[in-house]
């Protein structure tokens, strides 16, 4: 924690147990639930939930043979406040749905030969769009339907979209445009209403490009 106004730093250390601190020194994305708890993605330590009121931690880590998170390398997280669902994207473990009311996990993974499954088990970002989720993966972007568990891969069959493989980050702006950070391909914008996909690549000859 850092407060730039007062130059106050607080360090949150790792530990061997939940009572001692974080489960991993490598942390990534975070979100906050309705109770003010911080949900922290880690690399190798699963998801850590930090209760700021009583300064305690809860770890969600993979446990073989039990209902648990599918992988401990966690890259993305999105909190559905209305339905009390935490959506968790993992590296090699697919997409996880944690129902906070029951504390049960449901895992969605890539299935060979099934076009309605995830395009990759490496999930890098999750953003909401209407009643669905836009999911960034190592193999493009898909529109995930939480009600059915089915994925619709976006623009992969189009000429403009074939080059989109590994996607690092997503953002939907106030006008409903989806912005896609594609590794090695620059930035794309996508309009759901028209299906228009536009690429903004790096051009060494153009100093005004990315």
Region spans (language model):
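Carboxylate-rich, polar loop motifs that coordinate divalent cations or form catalytic acidic clusters
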Residues: 1-210
């Amino acid at each position: 924690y850092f407060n730039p106004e007062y130059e106050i730093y607080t360090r949150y250390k790792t530990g061997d147990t939940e009572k001692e601190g974080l489960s991993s020194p490598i942390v990534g994305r975070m979100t906050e639930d309705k109770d003010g708890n911080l949900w922290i993605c880690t690399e190798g330590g699963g998801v850590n939930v930090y209760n700021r009121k009583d300064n305690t931690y809860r770890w969600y880590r993979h446990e073989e043979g039990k209902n648990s998170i599918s992988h401990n390398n966690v890259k993305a997280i999105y909190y559905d406040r209305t339905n009390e669902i935490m959506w968790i994207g993992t590296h090699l473990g697919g997409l996880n749905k944690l129902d906070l009311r029951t504390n049960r996990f449901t895992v969605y993974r890539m299935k060979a030969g099934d076009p309605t499954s995830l395009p990759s088990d490496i999930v890098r970002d999750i953003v909401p769009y209407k009643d669905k989720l836009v999911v960034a993966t190592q193999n493009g972007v898909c529109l995930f339907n939480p009600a059915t568990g089915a994925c619709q891969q976006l623009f992969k069959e189009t000429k403009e979209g074939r080059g989109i493989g590994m996607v690092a980050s997503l953002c939907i702006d106030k006008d409903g445009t989806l912005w896609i950070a594609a590794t090695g391909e620059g930035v794309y914008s996508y309009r759901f209403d028209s299906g228009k996909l536009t690429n903004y690549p790096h051009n060494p000859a153009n100093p005004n490009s990315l």
